[in-house]
Amino acid sequence: MAVTFYDLSSEAGLEKLDEYLLSRSYISGYQASKDDLAVHAALAKPPSSKYVNVSRWYNHVEALLRISGVSAEGCGVTVEGSSVATPPVADTKASAAEDDDDDDVDLFGEETEEEKKASEERAAAVKASGKKKESGKSSVLLDVKPWDDETDMTKLEEAVRSIKMDGLLWGASKLVAVGYGIKKLQIMLTIVDDLVSVDDLVEDYLTAEPANEYIQSCDIVAFNKI
């Protein structure tokens, strides 16, 4: 179902978008799509931190564009009062190639005291209104390290993505050189906090049989509530 937003250059437009994203990670569906690119392109500049949900979503889309691009079609979105130009997928992939040499990727940024306070106030408002609060979600950036330079990284990533469980969604990934011909897999994932424990995911699945044929160890690079 198509979504329409109005004049995202105005405070009223940003407030509506912020309210819309209060209970959503993306504009439509459960992964970034061209709908997110359309709304992202309609914003002339990064949103103020007072729009907590818009800022969180904007930073997440920026990170995806840096490392892999967005290709999902989405459900359709219209932004009235703005000139929207959705970036082509090829351009985002080119940008990702330029960033392949970066070992450290700051996907989420630090949450400010102002953002924390605003989040708490919104949660209190939802509770006071009698609405059922959705289970929290988190975005995680994981480093997955192979045994040596002879490890087949394609099979390593296949082993990672073969792990399925309720509340777990694998996202964008890239290979990052660490030296001596060895590369590590850097991969994003979204989890439902009540259903998935990252520690259990690493210990019981990623570094256990059969995945440990390719995976030596895993490190949590970034963990952000969304």
UniProtKB/Swiss-Prot annotation:
GO cellular component term, pick one: cytosol
Cystine residue pairs: none
CDD domains found in the cross-reference section: EF1B (cd00292)
Transmembrane segments: none
UniProt superkingdom: Eukaryota
Keyword Hydrolase listed: no
Chain spans, region Disordered: 82-131
Comp. bias (Acidic residues): 97-113
PROSITE patterns: EF1BD_1, EF1BD_2
Family: Belongs to the EF-1-beta/EF-1-delta family.
Protein name (record): Elongation factor 1-delta
Biological source species: Spuriopimpinella brachycarpa
Lineage: Eukaryota, Viridiplantae, Streptophyta, Embryophyta, Tracheophyta
